[in-house]
Amino acid sequence: VALEPDAIPEQADLGRLETLLGGVLAENPDVSDPVYRTNVPLALLQLRKARMVSGRGGQADRLYISEALSALRRFADRERYAPEPDRLVEMAYVAGNDGTAQPYYVFLPRTYDPEREEPWPLMVFLHGYVPSISILQPWVLDVETCRIAADLGCILLIPYGRRNTDFQGVGETDVLAGIREVRELFPVDPDRIYLSGVSMGGMGTWNLALRHPGLFAAATPITGQTDMHAWWPRLLPDWPLDRDDLWPFRRMLVEWDNPIDLVRNARNQKLFVQHGENDLLIPVKQSLDMVAAAHALGIPIRVHVFPGASHYIYWDRPCFENAWGWAVQQHLDRSPAHVTYKTYSLEYDTAFWARILAFVRWGREAVLDCRVADDGVLHIDTVNVADVRIDTEPAPLPEPGPDGYAVRVNGEARSVVPSVDGSLTIAVEPGAGVVPGGDTWLPRKRKGLCGPVEEVFDGPFLVVPGTGGAGADQERVRRNAMTWIQEWDRFADGIPRIRVDSELTTAEIRAHNLVLFGGPETNSVVAAI
């Protein structure tokens, strides 16, 4: 990249910083380069902060601009940013969905050595709900609490989570992106990644662990919700007390990220939950009911209730010492003999070595139960599953016979020959419904093209206002698009990418979900559809 160190001033205003960053991005740099990844996104984040405080008075904008210039200077000098140990350090990445620079926070042990032969365990902490949270005022842990993880030998990661998202949707993608960044920039042990969180982050811990079995070696939720069917009636007086009284589509949207409905996904996961006995915000019953539901399926979950304690057990350190001290003793087992999984969307399709490839019917729960018996036969039992893939490398299967692997699918005996990569692809039952013939409707529901609408914003998307029609129509479309963009910013802390319909390219259409504003008379993309 043609950015010389002497081209970066000691001081600059917002306009000059924007010009410098624009020049870097215009050169199409290698975004996988660690020097780029540890500096340029951080400079973009500081630019965002400087814009937010510009005009408020004081020196805050100059401080953020100075930090951005320091990051650009390191980039020009080909210097990878190396966080200082024993200090909570802000880093950043560019989000794949809306293209905004987002923060995450890293705390390295005092003994951290990137050249150490043994990789480092990673502790991921999810914060609680705070109405005022922003990139200017993130919810992070104090240094002494960070040191609990560090003194246990862990790198500590605190994702931002896009404000207050329950770590679902865009918040979940932020957590996974932060984990990916840290794994690729630091020597992390993939079999010792631990997840923990408090309050809202406690529920996020349940959700991420249950949606991604096989990712975390242990999960330790603290004072988190587990059943939104019991939670919403406490807040919304018109919410039905009985889940059967919800319209089916609404019930599905509650249950697809409701921990207690995903409890079977806890099988083979190491979980330790803590709660205050007298928690008036999130009753201890939320945790105890989850533990009971797991035990009913033969799934053990460790639990500790603090006698007489309120919701805010995480204002003291014992809950962290309990959770993290226990977690670091756990290692991920990638080859359990019995795997169970429930999902409502193919965005979440994998448990350890078993993957759901297709549903029979969309909009309904799918359940997968895979078990390697003592005689080596693979038993697969399903509900609403059309196709399954088995990764035979981690699966504890014997060597295949001359006719392949012995499998029983919903009680039917089969012999399945592995594919070239060694995996097994098994057709369980055909998908239901009628698919129009010919070219009348080419797209079929598949992973990434199925909904719910939340999934539009989990992947790359563009806001596309129309530019056609009369002046008043154009102004209405523009105003509606800007209103939505501001709503997104208030929710997810970032201004998403915008492309008017007349400038949208075929390549951009292929690479993005489109959020279209206007009708056929004002938006050429809507007209084409």
Residue ranges and their predicted role:
Residues 195-197, 222, 274:
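Short beta-strand immediately N-terminal to the catalytic nucleophile in serine-hydrolase-like folds
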Residues 435-529:
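Long, folded non-catalytic interaction modules
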Residues 3-120, 451:
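A domain-start/cap signature at the N-terminus of enzymes
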Residues 266, 272-275, 279:
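Short beta-strand/loop motif that positions the catalytic acidic residue
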Residues 278-280, 284-377, 384:
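C-terminal catalytic histidine-bearing segment of alpha/beta-hydrolase fold enzymes
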Residues 110-118, 166-200, 210-216, 265:
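Gly/Ser-rich "nucleophile elbow"/oxyanion-hole loop immediately N-terminal to the catalytic nucleophile
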Residues 132-141, 217-264, 268-269:
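Mobile cap/lid helix-loop segments that gate and shape the active-site cleft of serine hydrolases
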Residues 119-185, 462:
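Active-site machinery of serine-nucleophile hydrolases
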